[in-house]
């Protein structure tokens, strides 16, 4: 790109500072739906006891999500998004824009990094559940055939599927793996009642093999390795809908 066009360094001369902010995918998708150069939300920066607090509020007219993964849906996106501020870490990061005539312009130098996270709410929990359900759906779909299948299959003493199923039951201590979405629903339901669980209790609740259950837990939860809740599991911050309590070190 630089070989074909000119490079405008006005931003460097003006020493323009910019923020590099990571936002959730659904938020960027909602911004893209805004008409023209309309307002997408409000950014608030406040000082509390010498500490900078930043948050973004999405406009109400952009909060409605009508599709998830290309499938029709009806859910409201979280509107409140507090920022988690991060240092640049000694790096020199810059932001460029490119015009239709291949002209590059330096817009500014990154002076602050941040992550825009949704506040814990029922809307966010419902959105995450729909996203998990959509991602868990099988890619392969059944198809109706136009012609009658004439291939003859000979009867067998036992089908391969049943053999594999019985083998897995023995290997997993007679616990057969349930559908992933069903296990997720059981886990979310359990964590709505209590914030912390040890693995043994979750195995008793879900009736799932330990290895399989831990694979799913690692997607939505974290294991505490210290403090008064050592060796227990709790939901990751993005899946919680309760106020986090203080942890002991």
UniProtKB/Swiss-Prot annotation:
GO terms for molecular function: DNA binding; RNA polymerase II general transcription initiation factor activity. The modification Phosphoserine is found at residues 142, 248. The modification N6-acetyllysine is found at residues 22, 33, 137. Signal peptide: none annotated. Belongs to the TFIIF beta subunit family. Keywords: Acetylation, DNA-binding, Nucleus, Phosphoprotein, Transcription, Transcription regulation. GO terms for biological process: positive regulation of transcription by RNA polymerase II; transcription by RNA polymerase II; transcription elongation by RNA polymerase II; transcription initiation at RNA polymerase II promoter. One of its GO terms (cellular component) is transcription factor TFIIF complex. TFIIF is a general transcription initiation factor that binds to RNA polymerase II and helps to recruit it to the initiation complex in collaboration with TFIIB. The gene is GTF2F2. It comes from Homo sapiens (Human). It is found in: Nucleus. Disulfide bonds: none annotated. This is General transcription factor IIF subunit 2. InterPro entries: TFIIF_beta, TFIIF_beta_HTH, TFIIF_beta_N, TFIIF_interaction, WH-like_DNA-bd_sf, WH_DNA-bd_sf. Its main location: nucleus. The modification N-acetylalanine is found at residue 2. Heterodimer of an alpha and a beta subunit. Interacts with HTATSF1 and GPBP1. Interacts with URI1. Interacts with GTF2B (via N-terminus); this interaction is inhibited in presence of GTF2F1. It comes from the Eukaryota. Gene3D superfamilies: Winged helix-like DNA-binding domain superfamily/Winged helix DNA-binding domain. DNA binds at residues 227, 229.
């Amino acid at each position: 790109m630089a070989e074909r066009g000119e490079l405008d360094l006005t931003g460097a001369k003006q020493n323009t500072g910019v923020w590099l902010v990571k936002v959730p995918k659904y938020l960027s998708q909602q911004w893209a739906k805004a008409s023209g150069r309309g307002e997408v939300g409000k950014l608030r920066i406040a000082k509390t006891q010498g500490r900078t607090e930043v948050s973004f509020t999405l406009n109400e007219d952009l909060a409605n999500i009508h599709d998830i993964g290309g499938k029709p849906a009806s859910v409201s996106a979280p509107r409140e998004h507090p920022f988690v501020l991060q240092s640049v870490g000694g790096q020199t990061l810059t932001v460029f824009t490119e015009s239709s005539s291949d002209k590059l312009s330096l817009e500014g130098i990154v002076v602050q990094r941040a992550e825009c996270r949704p506040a814990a709410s029922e809307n966010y929990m419902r959105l995450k559940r729909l996203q998990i359900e959509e991602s868990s759906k099988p890619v392969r779909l059944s198809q109706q055939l136009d012609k009658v299948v004439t291939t003859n299959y000979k009867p067998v003493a036992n089908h391969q599927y049943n053999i594999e199923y019985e083998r897995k039951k023995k290997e997993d201590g007679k616990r057969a793996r349930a559908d992933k979405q069903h296990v997720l629903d059981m886990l979310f339901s359990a964590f709505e009642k209590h914030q912390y669980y040890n693995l043994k209790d979750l195995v008793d609740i879900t009736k799932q093999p330990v290895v399989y259950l831990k694979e799913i837990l690692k997607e939505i939860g974290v294991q505490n390795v210290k403090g008064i809740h050592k060796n227990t599991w709790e939901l990751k911050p993005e899946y919680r809908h309760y106020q986090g309590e203080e942890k002991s070190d």
